[in-house]
Amino acid sequence: MTVLIDTRITSAHQISDLCCALGYDITSTQLDVGQLNGYFRVVLCGKQLFLLLSADKPVVIYGSRLAEYSSFGMFLSDFKVAHHTHAHGHKAVANWSSSFSPLHDETFLQLAPNVPMLVAYVAHSDLKNSALNWHEHDALHKITNKQFAVFQPEAYERIVRAAMYRLLYPSP
C-alpha cells in the first residue's frame, strides 16, 4: 500500500487540484465564506483507492468519475447533523452508500460541514469476484444496478471498517 496524498486543505479549489492528480476532472465549490479547514487522504492498495475527505464548510463537488472503478461513497457521521449531505440528489441515511454503479459517468455530491466522506474505489472485476466469493449476490446486484443502497448494518460496517483500515494503516 502507498499513501498517495495526505494533506490539510484550505480551499475547495485545492480539492479539485488534488482530485485532478487522481484522474478526475472535477469542480469543487465552497458554499460558505471564510477559509476552509479540512483534510484529504488517499491510499493506493493494489488496484484499489481509498479516499477520506473532511471540511468545516459545505462543499459541492461535481465532475467526472474513474470509469474502471465502482466507488462506495459513505458519509461518516450522526445523520441527524448531516441533513445537508447528499450524493446525486439523494440524502444520506444510516448504512447508506452511493455512486457505485459502473453506469455512472459523473460525480455530484455535497459535503456538510464536519461530516467526513469515505470513498473506496474498487475495480469492477475485483468487486464482482469478491461478491461471488462472499456469496453476496444481492449486494452485487444493488451495486451494479442502482445509484445508492441502504445495506444491512453488519455489511455496511464491514465495508467501512475495511476501507478505514486501509486508510489509517497502510503497510509499507
Model regions: which residues?
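N-terminal low-complexity or simple alpha-helical regulatory segments
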Residues: 1-71
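Alpha-helical bundle regulatory/interaction domains
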Residues: 2-8, 12, 16-24, 29, ...
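Residues in well-ordered beta-strands of folded domains
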Residues: 51-53, 73-75, 110, 121
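Short acidic (Asp/Glu) patches
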Residues: 54-59, 76-78, 100-105
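Short secondary-structure boundary segments
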Residues: 57-70, 74-75, 127-144
